[in-house]
Design a protein with these regions (language model features):
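Protein kinase catalytic-loop region centered on the HRD/HxD motif
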Residues: 132-142
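Short beta-strand micro-motifs within the conserved protein kinase catalytic domain, predominantly
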Residues: 85-97
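Conserved beta3-strand ATP-binding lysine motif
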Residues: 52-57
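Conserved activation segment of eukaryotic-like protein kinases, specifically the C-terminal portion
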Residues: 177-190
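AlphaC helix of the eukaryotic protein kinase fold
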Residues: 58-77
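Conserved short submotifs of the Hanks-type protein kinase catalytic core
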Residues: 94-108, 112
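Activation segment signature within eukaryotic-like protein kinase domains
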Residues: 126-127
Length: 312
């Protein structure tokens, strides 16, 4: 159970075609061609929401009802600025059991890629925010399993990332739909092998595929190198975590900052060495001058003494 829903089974066992009728302006937003879900936009009390429910052919099939409940429970655990916020699980009139989510006003990343509308600065921002979101999820032992451009929203206001669609996500707490999941072109190759386990490295592979798509738009060598590392087929050579990925020089602007700091440090050290050498040289010169002066005075004294003696 969750803080919002007292009994999920009670909701999923209810008549799928009856329920909350407070949602207005219901509009179909997306219907999965090969999957079991459909999306609607709707308003309630003047606020816009995204509703996710089962297609009519799957409304009464227990395994898909379980899958929807699983997605809700996983989504409810995630509170991060770069992850679409899951709000409630309700019975909505005409839709059945429905996940209520925040409405994201923006475009999915695939649209921006197709339109070539990604600048170098936006590309860096998207990659950094994706890493932040995945690191947060992985720290909670949750794997997305279907990261791809169409599951990543970029808001119109601020151009911030929002990861969506946790229908294939996996957590240690759930055992529904444990079969390999993902999309061709983005799924890690090891996930297609018998007995494959969901691991952070699989998400990192998918992240690399997404980064490569972005790099092809911006022609960024740094992002291409990053994508190549993430998509290494040998899982032992692939970064084991987002934190490890960050440690590589190309992973973020911290490399540039570190380089600048190192350069400043080298300049300071060079200045200290030059100043020390100058001071020592100056001191040695002064000491040598002093010795010469003393010798000169001594010679003068001796000369005077000889003269005086002769006079005497």
């Amino acid at each position: 159970t969750s803080g919002f829903t007292t009994n999920i089974k009670e909701i999923t066992d209810a008549d799928p075609m009856t329920g909350n009728n407070e949602y207005k302006n219901l509009k179909e937003f997306y219907v999965s061609e090969s999957g079991h879900a459909r999306l609607f936009t709707a308003t309630k009390y003047g606020k816009r929401f995204m509703l996710k429910c089962l297609k009519k052919d799957f409304l009464y099939i227990p395994v898909y009802q379980q899958a929807l409940s699983k997605e809700f429970e996983i989504g409810l655990q995630l509170e991060h600025p770069n992850i679409c916020h899951t709000i409630e699980l309700e019975q909505v009139d005409g839709l059945g059991t429905t996940i209520v989510m925040e409405y994201v006003d923006g475009d999915n990343l695939q649209t921006l890629i197709d339109r070539q509308q990604i600048t170098p600065s936006l590309a860096e921002k998207i990659v950094c925010q994706l890493m932040d979101a995945l690191e947060y999820m992985h720290n909670k032992q949750i794997i997305h399993r279907d990261l791809k451009p169409s599951n990543i929203m970029v808001t119109h206001n601020g151009q911030n990332v929002k990861i969506i669609d946790f229908g294939l996500s996996d957590s240690d707490s759930f055992y529904v739909l444990k079969t390999p999941a993902g999309t061709s072109g983005y799924i890690a190759p090891e996930q297609l092998l018998p007995g494959a386990k969901s691991e952070a490295r699989a998400d990192i592979y998918s992240l690399g595929c997404v980064i490569n798509d972005i790099a092809n738009v911006t022609n960024s060598n740094k992002l291409k190198k990053m994508a190549a590392l993430c998509t290494t087929r040998d899982t032992n050579l692939r970064p084991q975590s987002i934190n490890e990925l960050r440690s590589h020089s190309f992973s973020s602007s911290r490399y540039i900052i570190a380089t600048i700091i190192l350069a400043i440090y080298c300049l300071i050290m060079a200045g200290i060495i030059v100043a020390t050498y100058y001071n020592r040289s100056k001191q040695a010169a002064e000491e040598e001058t002093g010795i010469q002066t003393q010798n000169g005075d001594s010679n003068k004294w001796n000369d005077n003494k000889i003269v005086d003696y002769q006079q005497w």
